[in-house]
């Protein structure tokens, strides 16, 4: 049984290393394990547009066709207000999920807004049309309706006028307020900021801004549909992060949909072609995408990101459901192939791996001979027919005899 388990482990490790070597441009030195939740687990639909965690710790997923709620083990069904639920949520697109200071949940379902009363377990539609944007700011709920911002008055169960947007800039698609109580809106013509004199000024005239996000250092990040990610400090663009084809330190795509920050201050960027981790302090970028292997995201096109109370990052994809992982926990390390470097393999195709009694690794390759890695220093020694007396570089399998401390190989015969 031990031998069988060891063989399974080695085969899994081989698959991981093969996958990483083939995809070395898109993957970082260290990796994460993603847990995936899909339709087979009870999701109403595999396209996730919004994610939120409520006061009870449950995860809410807004999809193209309705709402799903996950308690950590399974999807659950809320029973209150079935008629309202069916009319406004079931089969509708849930674009946004936010929460007020009383822990009520607000859902933008198509162009209506539905409130879920947590203490009453009841749904209530509080506006049936003309919802262009919704946000929770300071525990209060605000919506953009035509050329105005309205504030929800829960005590009187009504919408109160908050402010008029005195600009002719098209439909408002997003409303935002930073920690300095400065207001921003996004329209089809760009991002506008309100100044103390009540005037609105365009600070980024790009017509495809997806969202605004404020990081812990006070920077405002603007995700765009085709122009990458912009960083603003004091209304000045100080950084523009884009996709540079063929470059490792690059965004997966210039189509950026969503941004959030983890507990360590790293920025996570969801794009149309994968997930990026951006170090604000160093400028380093790591990339993650679906590769079809166990532990990967199921889909690379990302629409939603959410950091939960325990620090887990939830990723909503276009057609792969939800993926969740811990940004603070790495489970594997990637060793690329570069025969000129002692910290790399000398050949990208790995056919077998064994560990000797000193815990060092012996890795046979299908074309590069044998690689030995010291587990303490992580330095490789490359052994091939040219410099070590091996009879072949095309090795198909490797076995270790612990009693005799010897290696056995199966090689390819021409």
Segments the model singles out, each with a brief description of its role:
Residues 1-414:
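Carboxylate-rich, polar loop motifs that coordinate divalent cations or form catalytic acidic clusters
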């Amino acid at each position: 049984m031990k031998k069988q388990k060891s063989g399974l482990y080695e085969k899994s490790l081989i698959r991981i290393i093969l996958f990483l070597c083939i995809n070395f441009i898109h993957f970082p030195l260290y990796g994460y394990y993603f847990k995936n939740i899909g339709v087979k687990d009870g999701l109403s639909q595999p396209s996730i547009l919004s994610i939120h965690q409520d006061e009870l710790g449950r995860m809410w997923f807004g999809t193209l066709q309705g709402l799903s709620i996950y308690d950590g083990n399974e999807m659950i069904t809320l029973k209150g207000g079935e008629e309202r639920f069916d009319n406004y949520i079931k089969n509708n697109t849930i674009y946004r999920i936010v929460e007020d200071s009383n822990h009520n949940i607000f859902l933008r379902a198509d162009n209506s807004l539905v409130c879920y009363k947590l203490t009453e377990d009841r749904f209530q539609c509080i506006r049936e049309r003309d919802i262009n944007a919704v946000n929770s700011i300071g525990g209060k709920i605000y919506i953009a309706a035509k050329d105005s911002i309205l504030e929800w008055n829960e005590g009187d169960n009504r919408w109160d006028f908050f402010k008029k947007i005195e600009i002719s800039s098209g439909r408002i698609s997003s409303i935002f307020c930073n920690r300095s109580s400065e207001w921003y809106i996004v329209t089809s013509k760009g991002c506008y900021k309100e100044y103390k004199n009540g005037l609105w000024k365009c600070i980024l005239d790009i017509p495809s801004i997806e969202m605004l996000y404020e990081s812990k250092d006070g920077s405002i990040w603007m995700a765009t549909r085709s122009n990458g990610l912009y960083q603003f400090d004091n209304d000045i663009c100080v950084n523009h992060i884009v996709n540079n084809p063929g470059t490792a330190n690059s965004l997966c795509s210039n189509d950026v949909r969503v941004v959030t920050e983890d507990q360590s201050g790293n920025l996570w960027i969801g794009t149309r072609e994968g997930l990026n981790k951006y170090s604000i302090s160093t400028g380093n970028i790591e990339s993650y995408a679906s590769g079809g292997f166990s532990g990967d995201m199921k889909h690379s096109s990302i629409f939603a990101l959410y950091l939960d109370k325990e620090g887990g990052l939830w990723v909503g994809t276009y057609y792969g459901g939800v993926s969740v992982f811990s940004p603070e926990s790495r489970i594997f390390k990637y060793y690329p192939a570069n025969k000129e470097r002692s910290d790399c393999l000398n050949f990208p195709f790995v056919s077998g791996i064994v560990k000797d009694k000193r815990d060092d690794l012996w890795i046979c390759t299908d074309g590069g001979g044998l690689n030995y890695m010291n587990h303490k220093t992580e330095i490789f020694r490359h052994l091939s027919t040219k410099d070590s007396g091996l009879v072949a570089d095309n090795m198909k399998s490797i076995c270790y005899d612990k009693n005799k401390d010897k290696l056995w190989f199966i090689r390819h015969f021409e």
